[in-house]
A protein has these predicted regions:
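Internal alpha-helical scaffold of NAD(P)-dependent oxidoreductase catalytic cores
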Residues: 87, 98, 123, 130-135, ...
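Conserved active-site and cofactor/substrate-binding residues in soluble primary-metabolism enzymes
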Residues: 11, 19, 39, 86, ...
Length: 344
């Protein structure tokens, strides 16, 4: 296969999809961006700004918006999926006729499908099957879309099984402010990007309750242990979670003021109801949906996930966040790593 990448299509014009599209277009790569909302499409076309999802960022002339999926996919060497996880399958079904010539499908979605408990690579396998002959990759890491749009230094992980194709994509996406590292652990990178959103809701709730820095640090650290346990049970490499797609993305999402998931948690910690919060935002807090999937995955694989379980009870059973913290703190006492070495 010829690995040259001359055109990229990005499916989804939320903040992340628009930021990636603008990054590539500013570097000189022609980009076609699929925009679902008519109003957003007209904004980008007429004002060169996505005021709804990436306000204040002037978009490069090399970025072309389209409302037709067929037009957006025309001539693409790489197709980037940047849609929320709950619509990923449906959009991919609509894209099936337009994959001729696409060398790599790159998933920028951070989530898990609730009905099937599949990560996006598995959804791709089920939807496209043997009809798609190209590669699959995913990208994750500590990367707020607004900061990428402002050209602030950012580093992410790109996971793909074929190193040569990975290096070709790495070259296309990397700039003086956006650094891409390669990995071969697709499962780990996908799960790190998805599960950190659940922990971020918990971290936000702790902040909203006013429990301080000690509590937040403990929750992040023990949350990473849960992400790693579940990831390894699902076939991921444990060291992936010590990298950008693991602890990097987790720390950012649990501490950054731009984190939608942390914001949801903070508001719940301050006494607001989830339905009130979600009804007043156009941005997607993926962690709300991912919490349900993560809870079910813990049951399916028999993995102990106390923090994720408590976030689930807060969101879906209406549990008082203070009671959830109390129950976490008064659980049976344990060793940190689960066992003692034979000699010490």
């Amino acid at each position: 296969m010829n690995l040259e990448i001359s055109k990229v299509s990005i499916i989804g014009a939320g903040g992340w999809g628009t930021a990636l599209a603008n990054l590539l277009a500013a570097k000189g790569t022609p980009v076609r961006l699929w925009v679902r909302e008519r109003e957003v499409f007209e904004q980008i076309r007429d004002t060169r700004e996505n005021k709804e999802f990436l306000p204040g960022i002037r978009l490069s002339a090399g970025l072309e918006p389209f409302q037709s999926l067929e037009d957006a996919m025309e001539g693409a060497d790489v197709a980037v999926m940047a849609v929320p996880s709950h619509v990923y399958r449906g959009v991919l079904e609509r894209l099936k006729p337009f994959f001729a010539g696409v060398k790599c499908l790159l998933s920028a979605t951070k989530g898990i499908e609730n009905d099937t408990l599949m990560i996006m690579s598995k959804v791709k396998d089920e939807v496209l099957g043997g009809t798609y002959k190209g590669y699959f990759a995913c990208i994750a890491g500590p990367s707020f879309a607004g900061e990428v749009g402002l050209r602030h230094p950012t580093a992410v992980t790109l996971a793909i099984c074929d190193r040569q194709m990975g290096e070709a994509i790495q070259q296309v996406f990397s700039t003086e402010f956006f650094r891409v590292y390669l990995s071969d652990d697709i499962t780990g990178v996908e799960l790190g990007g998805a599960l950190k959103n659940v922990i971020a809701i918990g971290a936000g709730a702790v902040d909203g309750l006013g429990f301080g820095h000690n509590a937040r640090a403990a929750l992040i650290t023990r949350g990473l242990a849960e992400i790693t346990r579940l990831g390894v049970a699902m076939g991921a490499q444990p060291f992936t979670f010590a990298g950008l797609a693991g602890i990097g993305d987790l720390v950012l999402t649990c501490t950054g003021d731009l984190s939608r998931n942390r914001t949801v948690g903070m508001r719940i910690g301050r006494g607001e109801r989830l339905d009130e919060i979600t009804s007043h935002t156009s941005m997607v807090a993926e962690g709300v949906r991912t919490t349900l999937a993560a809870y079910r995955l813990g049951l399916k694989f028999g993995v102990d996930l106390p923090i994720i379980d408590e976030v689930y009870r807060i969101l879906y059973e209406g549990k008082d966040p203070k009671a959830a913290v109390r129950d976490l703190m008064t659980r049976e006492l344990k060793t940190e790593r689960g066992h003692y070495s034979q000699e010490c």
